[in-house]
Design a protein with these regions (language model features):
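Conserved HGGG/HGGXW glycine-rich cap/lid loop of the alpha/beta-hydrolase fold
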Residues: 7-63
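Active-site loop/oxyanion-hole signature of alpha/beta-hydrolase fold enzymes
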Residues: 37, 52-95, 241
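Conserved hydrolase catalytic core segment
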Residues: 90-129
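Helix-rich cap/lid subdomain of alpha/beta-hydrolase
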Residues: 117-182
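Short beta-strand/loop motif that positions the catalytic acidic residue
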Residues: 189, 195-197
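Short alpha-helix in the alpha/beta-hydrolase fold that links the catalytic acid
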Residues: 191, 205-214
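Acidic catalytic loop of the alpha/beta-hydrolase fold
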Residues: 200-204, 229
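Catalytic active-site module of serine/aspartate enzymes centered on a nucleophile-bearing elbow/loop
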Residues: 219-220, 225-253
Length: 253
């Protein structure tokens, strides 16, 4: 996996394909190659250059040790812009899952001239007590599914428990501060946007994709009626076809 220096760290990233640049941002604690294993080769084979990084403090982009200050989503957005600039991409599409959806939407709002299209799923523009309760229900790794725990343990080893506890504490602090992650910025997103959601997502209630959809003018919303949090993995064929059609649709004049 190649790496490139950006302010504060050496960021590792997966790169595949040739064509239009497509940045894929993983979820909390996730890695680009792991979270998007069903998307990277698929899109790379269809005239996209996929860039799927390990965000600051995650996966192979360590050090630094990951922390969660009040601006961590915005810091991650700045890192992603720095990565794409270092790779020579001035304009690019962005796909984000979960925390990656939050980062991606912030990017599209902050520098709309750089983000050509936006695909987001599993994110939320604000926090409620329901999400905090859901996080605390899985605060102990023993409460995770064996598969999820095994996947993350392979990346972080014994550091996983403390890292995840710090993450949940960071979410609690954001909620205590009012819980607005980027809801106030949604109106600044001007690029074509596709919002996807699993109707049975146990972590992100349906009010969140609805709020993002309503907040971004002209955005589209697609619901996977039986989907949970990992719609891009569980329904990879349908997900890939839907997002590919959106990303390649000619812009309206």
């Amino acid at each position: 996996m190649p790496a490139i220096g950006i302010p504060g760290l050496s960021m590792h990233y997966e790169s595949a394909g040739k064509g239009a640049p497509l940045l894929m941002i993983p979820g909390a604690l996730g890695t680009g190659a792991g979270d998007f294993s069903a998307q990277i080769p698929w899109f790379a084979a269809r005239r996209f250059q996929v860039i799927a990084p390990d965000p600051r403090g995650y996966g192979q982009s360590r050090p630094p040790q990951r922390d969660f200050p009040s601006n961590f989503y915005y810091r991650d957005a700045a890192d992603m812009f720095a990565l794409m600039a270092a790779l020579g991409h001035d304009r690019f599409a962005v796909m984000g899952w979960s925390d990656g959806a939050n980062i991606a939407t912030i990017m599209a709002a902050q520098q709309p001239e750089k983000v050509t299209r936006l695909v987001v799923f599993g994110g939320q523009s604000f926090l409620t007590a329901e999400e905090i309760a859901a996080f605390n229900a899985i605060r102990k790794i023993s409460a995770w599914s064996p598969r999820a725990a095994e996947t993350m343990r392979a990346v972080y080893g014994e550091e996983l428990d403390e890292l995840w506890d710090r993450y949940v504490a960071g979410q609690e602090a954001l909620f205590a501060a009012g819980g607005d992650l980027y809801r106030r910025l949604l109106a600044k997103v001007t690029c074509p946007t596709l919002v996807l959601h699993g109707a049975k997502d146990p972590l992100v209630p349906g009010l969140h994709p609805e709020a993002i959809h309503r907040g971004i003018a002209g955005s589209r919303l697609h619901i996977f009626s039986e989907g949970k949090h990992n719609i891009h993995q569980r329904y990879a064929d349908d997900f890939n076809a839907l997002t590919f059609a959106f990303l390649t649709q000619p812009e309206r004049s």
